[in-house]
A protein has these predicted regions:
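Aromatic-lined, polymer-binding surfaces characteristic
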Residues: 79, 90-93, 107-275, 285-316
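CBM-like carbohydrate-recognition segments
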Residues: 51-74, 124, 330-407
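Non-catalytic carbohydrate-binding regions of carbohydrate-active enzymes
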Residues: 266, 270-354, 383-398
């Protein structure tokens, strides 16, 4: 080979090497599965909270951010919001059995931290004893703690020692001091009482049934409830109304096997169908690029808007119109690993936060990760990704027509 040709080939090889390395890197990055992405994001969200709280250091180390329009309530509500909302989204994942995969090791670590954190939360001697006995706000986030126990009963409630369990029963019971307004707050009382019922403790049936009856009255049609007597176009059907209504009905009626004699219109199976319809609407909200509409209050809760879709997937309740691969692909397109825990919708945007919002509130975002409670070999994770409705529509593909849901 002539020297000039050799030098030319050497130059080409040197120039191509970075490109080849980049291509190999991209290929390696592409090999990250959707489940690995989801698990990584949720671990990143949960680890700083639980690692600190397990040692009683959350309140010492968490930097609190309050809305510029904060209403002056005790800022310590932040820690209860952070912990309760996080655990409501994390509970299904932590309920999976242990294994020696990288994910399994992270999950086991989070569960160990979580169980210690639960104990810290109700120990009056702990620096991380939460604000159970002041303000009305603790009712809200106690409901998310209770919801975490409902969603992960065997993994998160059963292993707690008897003293910690007794303390939770006492804290949940004393929250009857809070008279909830006639809004989604009624479901917070109901969720706490439903957990007490499941745990074999004395529950207040009136607080459960009156809430269920009121929410049933607030159904306005086509998968939507009003949040109180007047309808508001926001995401509270996602954050509270659909999930807690269905889960309370599930507990109180034994999955629809029993009827509520003084509230016969409160029907578990029908509430499921409404949530399925709402899930179909949420799926259509997701744009081809993975964005969703920004409207209504509490938009800083980000992916918490997807909770009904996540709950339907985790519980195996997806309607026939939505496939596993379609829902997983749509939800994965929405997730963003950055900027979860600061006031804002996408990064730091404090002025869009509401008067009741702090950075603990934002852990509502964890509620989109419920499908991690499905094992890795479940069709939700193994089915090939499919284009979701908006992606098909804007891509010029055939897509299903949408029709209103009537009862």
């Amino acid at each position: 080979m002539r020297k000039s040709n050799y030098l030319w080939l050497l130059l080409v090889a040197v120039l191509l090497l970075p490109a080849q390395e980049m291509a190999a890197k991209k290929k390696k990055e592409k090999e990250v599965t959707d489940r690995e992405l989801w698990a990584g994001v949720l671990y990143q969200m949960a680890a700083p909270v639980l690692s600190n709280m397990s040692e009683g250091k959350l309140q010492e180390n968490m930097q609190v951010e309050l809305s510029p329009t904060w209403d002056g309530r005790d800022k310590r509500v932040t820690y209860m919001e952070c912990f309760g909302r996080l655990m409501a989204g994390l509970a299904p994942w932590l309920s999976l059995p242990d294994d020696d995969t990288a994910e399994g090791k992270q999950r086991r670590q989070l569960r160990e931290w979580a169980l210690k954190s639960y104990a810290q939360a109700v120990d009056p001697e702990s620096q991380d004893y939460l604000l159970w006995r002041k303000e009305g706000q603790p009712l809200v986030d106690a409901a998310y703690v209770a919801e975490s126990f409902l969603r992960g009963y065997d993994a998160l409630w059963v292993p707690l020692d008897s003293l910690t369990k007794r303390r939770y029963i006492e804290e949940f019971t004393q929250l009857r001091r809070v008279d909830p307004p006639y809004t989604n707050w009624l479901l917070f009382s109901s969720t706490v009482e439903c957990f007490l019922r499941k745990a074999g403790s004395k529950s207040d049936a009136y607080r459960i049934v009156s809430a269920l009856r009121k929410v049933e009255e607030w159904y306005v049609g086509d998968g939507f409830y009003s949040d109180g007597p007047g309808f508001a176009f926001d995401y509270y059907n996602s954050f509270v109304l659909h999930p807690m209504y269905v889960e309370c009905l599930e507990v109180f009626t034994n999955s629809g096997k029993n009827k509520i004699w003084n509230a016969p219109d409160c029907n578990f199976q029908r509430a499921q169908k409404r949530m399925q319809r709402f899930g179909m609407i949420l799926e259509r909200f997701i744009s081809p690029e993975g964005a969703f509409p920004v409207f209504g209050r509490s938009i800083t809760y980000r992916t918490g808007t997807l909770q009904p879709l996540a709950l339907l997937a985790w519980r195996g309740w997806l309607p026939k119109e939505l496939s596993n691969g379609q829902v997983r692909a749509a939800m994965t397109a929405v997730f963003n690993e950055k900027g979860f825990l600061t006031l804002g919708f996408n990064g730091s945007q404090p002025h869009i936060s509401d008067w009741y919002t702090n950075n603990g509130s934002l852990y509502m975002a964890s509620l989109a990760f419920l499908p991690l409670g499905l094992p890795a070999d479940h069709p939700f994770w193994t089915d090939a990704p499919q284009a979701w409705t908006s992606k098909k529509a804007w891509g010029g593909e055939e897509f299903p027509k949408d029709h209103a849901y009537y009862e």
